[in-house]
UniProtKB/Swiss-Prot annotation:
It comes from Thermotoga petrophila (strain ATCC BAA-488 / DSM 13995 / JCM 10881 / RKU-1). The gene is buk. Transmembrane segments: none annotated. It holds the Pfam family Acetate_kinase. InterPro entries: Aliphatic_acid_kin_short-chain, Aliphatic_acid_kinase_CS, ATPase_NBD, Butyrate_kin. This is Probable butyrate kinase. The lineage of its organism: Bacteria, Thermotogati, Thermotogota, Thermotogae, Thermotogales. It is an enzyme of class 2 (transferase).
Amino acid sequence: MYRILVINPGSSSTKVAVFEDEKKIAEKNLTHSAEELKKFKKSIDQEPLRRKAVEDFIDEVGYRIEDFSAIAARGGVLEPVPGGTYVVDEYMVDYLINRSPVDHVSNLAAVISYKLGKPYGIPCFVVDPVSVDEMCDEARFSGIPEIERKSYSHALNIKAVLRKVSREMGKTPEEVKIVVAHLGSGISVCACKNGKIIDVNNANDEGPFSIERTGELPVGDVVKTAYSSKHSAAELKEEFTKKGGLLAYLGTKDLRKALDSMETSRKAKLVVEAMAYQIAKEIGGMCAVLGDKPDAIVITGGMAHENRFVRMITDYIEKFGKVEVIPGELEMEALALGVLRVLRGEEKAKDYRSVIE
């Protein structure tokens, strides 16, 4: 039996869980107050605070660090890598602390795991990090040579969904062609073929607008805004990725509240319908690049809990193929199972430095 500690930081909380083989034994969402977090300039600076919270959880559930066979951590913004399970080592930790191109809370997980596990010789791993890049060559072109499209997505949940759906079909991930739409505070819509994410919108910069992100914007207007604005580049980036989308239009990040408002507000109705329209359009594009009719179109993520909203999307896309809805995220299970496959010898863990060099 393998006992695995799972660590998955979010913007204002850290999800932690204990698995014994495939079975989840304990789970908790460790919340961090805005007052606590605002003391830190960068996400990575929160590491001691969040590590202490994880240590307290371990004590609370009656374990010691040395009781674990391994630690599974959410993968941060690393250099582009193929999907898989990667060993957390000093090189990866240094990259996440000092060289990651994006200041994101996901960068914390591997650092926390390494500082917890290394003194006791506990192996630590990340699974399908945010920067999984398996895009086909054609998908990389942006329109100008100086800019290449980047693959930043909700890869962990997307890969978990791919495994789940293919297993239900009695096939391997390499044998199916599916489109996955992960709908959360950010949106990733991708085409999966031969077990790989061959195309995906960058969840920060492209695709549909979401709960708090603008998605793709007209280039001319972005340039005009940047040069006529008194805001810094960092402030504009925050405007586009944390203050855009549904929040900018309706002043709320609560999709359910926005859906309820549709009954009395024409504006709310139009905004929510526009978001569904843009998601459906992105799904249609991904269906096209698969080359064949998809085996399934999967809608997942937090927004997939809202049946009314899912229906708006499926009205557009059901003509393209079978639609399956998997609400929420499979991230904790995906992290544990990715590490379990390595511990059982079913899959070989990858060395991050070797892969990128």
